[in-house]
A protein has these predicted regions:
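Conserved, single-site charged/polar hotspot
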Residues: 1-234
Length: 234
């Protein structure tokens, strides 16, 4: 494997905060994308704003999957539905028709920094009651009404060094996320994939130490890289 991101066929969502006792649900990634967009934004917004927000939502989720953010902490899911940590997902809800159509078009497109391999950790908030370093959801509506394209909206909030990765390959779970929690002593192909990814990411973040032996064994060097990675992306 190249260590390049795949679009997962499915994603496992924890229906609560990370440490909260709550069920997990596994849904097709495209279904997840349509659900989050229907839960986070409004279908009546200008299409440029909807597209920009959906690209941020997709990239955020793919960053969680690609980096094994929760799996490397010993959890058995990829992402939560808590807006305190991740993005809103309402299990079983109906989705809006125009958003469903856009999800079918966009689910295998994401944003990343030029020269980086990992999908952008594209934080966002509503921009009215909550503000943050990332995109303002309501601010994106104003920019769309001012004639901004989805890409220009994204660069207004995340910086100009963005590129869209289109038609990313869809992979099985083996290509995308660890299937079980990873910890010191784990030895399997999931660990090997994690090692490849951490070494790729460390090209852009030199504070993350290189793992000298990509051998699928979760030993001290891998643990040190995971710890530094978690500090960087926390």
């Amino acid at each position: 494997p190249t260590g390049l991101p795949y679009i997962p066929e499915s994603i496992t969502v924890h229906l609560g905060r990370p440490d909260e006792s709550a069920p997990n649900v596994t849904v097709p990634f495209q279904t997840y994308v349509a659900n989050v967009a229907s839960s986070e934004i409004y279908p009546t917004w200008p299409e440029s704003a909807i597209r920009a927000n959906m690209l941020a939502q997709i990239s955020f989720a793919l960053n969680r999957v690609y980096t094994g953010y929760y799996r490397t902490r010993g959890y058995d899911f990829d992402i939560t539905n808590s807006t305190q940590y991740d993005q809103y997902f309402v299990n079983g809800r109906d989705v809006f028709e125009n958003i469903q159509q856009l999800a079918a078009e966009l689910f295998n497109t994401y944003i990343r920094r030029v020269g980086n391999v990992e999908p952008l950790f594209a934080q966002y908030c509503n921009g009215t009651t909550v503000t943050c370093n990332g995109m303002s959801q309501w601010g994106s509506v104003d920019l769309a009404r001012a004639g901004y394209t989805p890409y220009r909206i994204l660069t207004a909030y995340y910086g100009s060094d963005l590129e869209l990765v289109r038609n990313a390959p869809v992979g099985t779970v083996q290509n995308t996320a660890p299937t079980s929690p990873l910890r010191l002593g784990s030895a399997n192909n999931d660990v090997r994939l994690l090692q490849i990814r951490l070494n790729r990411i460390s090209n852009n973040y030199p504070n993350i130490p290189k793992i000298p032996y990509v051998n699928g064994i979760f030993a001290d060097a891998t643990e040190n890289a995971v710890r530094e990675f978690q500090k960087t992306f926390n």
